[in-house]
Amino acid sequence: MKQEKKRRPFRGKYDGFTLFLVPGLTLCLASLESWFGTNLSVVCSSGGLRLGFALWGILAGVYYMRYTFYLFRLGNYREGAGRGLVFTAGGFLIAAVLIPYEPDLKPQAAILHVALAFLAPVLLAGALTLFLRFISRCSRKRFRKAWQIMWYLEGGALAVFLTAGFINSFLELYVVTGLCGYLRYLERLLRRGISPSRSW
């Protein structure tokens, strides 16, 4: 029985969202126009796509918050700083998609939209960094690969941004799918028992 259980493929708690819904919807929106010449805010600024864009952002924001808090529970992480960053990141993303991106008609609102959308993944990355520091206390060696993957993802995002000179749809798709995959990877590590607390 134990051997059969070990052979089972890993299934994450939110695999339906992680593997299909969130990245799939992002890909659909990004594919409406060029991945490299525009971004989701511009693509979805027309009236027909605004509702879909808002629903996508709300879904993604809630998903990232719930998944991250689930990982916090697995890792027995209760520090307020990380939780506050997650709430703020999710709130920023949801607020961003609810603010219409109309730089010609409402330039100040457009600036706020861009700022909130930019800060959301940055704050989430900050929360995950605090979480990794906490769970690495038991054995940093065990989480070395998790740290490396985080730096690679962040370095890749920075490289895409510097190459393009602005936030394009490819970068948005990269960040969304990268975060989905990284959260699932952390869940797999924690559920294997590499956690400061085994009481979960």
Identify the residue ranges that each predicted region occupies.
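Membrane-interface helix-boundary motifs at transmembrane edges
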Residues: E4-F10, F69-R83, R133-K145, R192-S199
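Membrane-proximal helix-loop-helix units in multi-pass membrane proteins
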Residues: A89-A146
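Transmembrane alpha-helical segments of multi-pass membrane proteins
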Residues: G80-I94, K145-G155
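N-terminal topogenic module of multi-pass integral membrane proteins
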Residues: M1-Y77
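Non-cytosolic membrane-interface motifs at loop->transmembrane helix junctions
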Residues: V42-S45, L105-F118, S169-G178
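Juxtamembrane "helix-exit" motif on the non-cytosolic side of transmembrane helices
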Residues: Y70-R73, L98-K106, F134, A159-I167
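Hydrophobic cores of alpha-helical transmembrane segments in multi-pass inner/ER membrane proteins
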Residues: F17-L25, G52-Y67, L119-L130, V176-R191
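Terminal transmembrane helical module of multi-pass membrane proteins
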Residues: R133-W200
